[in-house]
């Protein structure tokens, strides 16, 4: 479990990026972490991974304080950063060097994912394209079988077929004992695989709930007439009419349009 209570964080003497920030994430969750540019998504992931220290409050991840960076904690956390560099090694050499750090590493799992991504152990990392290197990092991180998997913009650099592969591989690879945190601006890339959505804005959690509850509490539909859309909680004009969010009122559940819902939440906050 991830339990964040009343943390403060700022870079140098700048104003607080997070002030009195709290968030809880249960084991078995695949969380979509959403927010505008500069909202602090990457910083939050670094705090959870122990790459940055908090300045107040507490973060506890599966019983560990991340900033203490105990080896037993680090062995159970895998991070795929948005920006990365890899050494001039073969995949095989890279894996041989790093897999001893992860006691639950699965070599057979790695080989299976590499094959699905059309990568080979003798491939040279520095000769791969950016998208291929990203796919290798995804394969390695999933093969670590860490209890916490942190993915910062994992679909950046992937083409459309690779994004589909990523979704299928992720869903088939994780277990109910793991927590997966995915920060992204590409909402449509993850809306079919996450079960929980967290939205942060201005240093606060403005929404945290399961997609099941969102589907139960809100109705997503397309209206053809403006007067119908104007009665909704929120709407956006589109080529096929007006995409609307309304209160569910015990209606039949509808598919959650996560991008529309994110826009609704952030627009609502901007008016407060």
What are these regions (language model features)?
Residues 57-68, 72-73:
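Conserved ABC transporter NBD signature motif
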């Amino acid at each position: 479990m991830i339990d964040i209570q009343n943390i403060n964080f700022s870079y140098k003497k700048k104003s607080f990026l997070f002030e009195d920030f709290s968030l809880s994430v249960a084991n078995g969750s695949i969380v979509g972490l959403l927010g505008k540019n500069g909202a602090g998504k990457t910083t939050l992931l670094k705090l959870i991974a122990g790459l940055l220290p908090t300045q107040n409050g507490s973060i506890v991840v599966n019983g560990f304080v991340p900033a203490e960076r105990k080896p037993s904690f680090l062995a159970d956390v895998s991070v795929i950063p948005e920006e990365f560099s890899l050494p001039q090694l073969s995949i095989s050499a890279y894996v041989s060097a790093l897999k001893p750090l992860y006691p639950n590493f699965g070599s057979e799992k790695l080989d299976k994912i590499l094959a699905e991504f059309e990568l080979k152990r003798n491939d040279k990392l520095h000769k791969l394209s950016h998208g291929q290197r990203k796919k290798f990092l995804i394969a390695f991180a999933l093969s670590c079988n860490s209890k916490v998997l942190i993915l910062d913009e994992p679909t950046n650099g992937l083409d459309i077929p690779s994004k589909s592969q990523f979704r299928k591989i992720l869903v088939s690879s994780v277990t109910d004992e793991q927590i997966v945190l995915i920060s992204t601006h590409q909402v449509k890339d993850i809306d079919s695989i996450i079960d929980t959505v967290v939205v942060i804005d201005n240093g606060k959690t403005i929404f945290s709930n399961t997609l099941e509850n969102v589907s139960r509490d809100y109705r997503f539909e397309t209206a053809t007439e403006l007067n119908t859309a104007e009665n909704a909680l929120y709407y956006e004009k589109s080529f096929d009419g007006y995409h609307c969010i309304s209160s569910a009122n015990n209606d039949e559940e509808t598919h959650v349009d996560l991008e529309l819902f994110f826009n609704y939440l952030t627009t609502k906050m901007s008016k407060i």
